[in-house]
Amino acid sequence: MLYLTKIRNAESEFTGNEQKIADFLRANVSELKSVSSRKMAKLLGISQSSIVKFAQKLGAQGFTELRMALIGEYSASREKTNATALHLHSSITSDDSLEVIARKLNREKELALEQTCALFDYARLQKIIEAISKAPFIQITGLGGSALVGRDLSFKLMKIGYRVACEADTHVQATVSQALKKGDVQIAISYSGSKKEIVLCAEAARKQGATVIAITSLTDSPLRRLAHFTLDTVSGETEWRSSSMSTRTAQNSVTDLLFVGLVQLNDVESLKMIERSSELTQRLK
C-alpha cells in the first residue's frame, strides 16, 4: 500500500503529534528532499523519536525510508496528473470543484501560519524588534509578492513614526542600500533567499554597517548567510503554483508580529499616532 494512502486511512488513529506529522508530510511532500527529521522536529515542536515512531507505525524502517518513498509517490502522482488534469496551483487541479479548492486553499494557509509560528525564536524576535526600534532609518526590500508584503509593512511602520524606504524599482533599492549607515536596518523579504537583486542589496547594506534582517525560508541561501538575523517562514506551496499565496500568508504573519511588537514597545505614543492617522483619513471621506 502507498504511504500517502496509509496516512489517509490511519488518520482516525493518530495522536495529536502524529496528526501534526501527517499534515506536514502531505502539505510539504514536494520539498521533502531538503527536510531532515531534526529540522521537521524543530518545525513541529516535537521530538525526533516521535517522527521515527510515526514512520515505523506506517511500516517503514525509519524516517529516511518514509521520506524517500513519499518523494517517489509524489513524482509518480505528478506524472499521472499531468496526463489527466491541469495543475492550477499547488495541489489544486482543473478537476477540483470550487468547494474542494476552497478547502485546499484554507488548509494550505492554515498550515503556513501554524508551521511559521512554530519556528519563532521569541528571544531573537525581541532583539530584532529592539534593533528596528532604534534604527534611524529602515529599508525594506523584496520582489513580486514579497514586495507587496514589504510595502504593507512600510505603511504600518510609517504610521507609528519610523523613517522607511520601500521602493519597487530594483535600481532604487540598490541605491538606497549603499547609502545606509551603522545603526540603520534593512529588512530583506525573499522566500527563496536567492534573488540576485535582494542579495546584492543585502551585501551593500552589510558593507555599510547596517543590520540586515531576512524574512526567508529555512533553506540555506545567500541571503540567509548574509543576514545578521533571520525570521523563518514556511509555505507548503510546490513548484505548481500560480501565485505565492501561502508564502505571502506566512510572510504577513511575521511582519504583522513585528509591527505589533514595535507598537507594544512604545505603546502610548504609537497609539496616539495611529489615532491621528485614523482621524485624518476619516476627514478624506
Curated annotation (Swiss-Prot):
It comes from the Bacteria. Keywords: Carbohydrate metabolism, DNA-binding, Repressor, Transcription, Transcription regulation. The keyword Transmembrane does not apply. One of its GO terms (biological process) is N-acetylmuramic acid catabolic process. Residues 128-268 form the SIS domain. Residues 37-56 bind DNA. InterPro entries: Homeodomain-like_sf (IPR009057), HTH_RpiR (IPR000281), RpiR-like (IPR047640), RpiR-like_SIS (IPR035472), SIS_dom (IPR001347), SIS_dom_sf (IPR046348), Tscrpt_reg_HTH_MurR (IPR022821), WH-like_DNA-bd_sf (IPR036388). Pathway: Amino-sugar metabolism; N-acetylmuramate degradation [regulation]. One of its GO terms (molecular function) is DNA binding. Residues 1-77 form the HTH rpiR-type domain. NCBIfam families: PRK15482.1. Homotetramer. Represses the expression of the murPQ operon involved in the uptake and degradation of N-acetylmuramic acid (MurNAc). Binds to two adjacent inverted repeats within the operator region. MurNAc 6-phosphate, the substrate of MurQ, is the specific inducer that weakens binding of MurR to the operator. This is HTH-type transcriptional regulator MurR. It comes from Escherichia coli O17:K52:H18 (strain UMN026 / ExPEC).
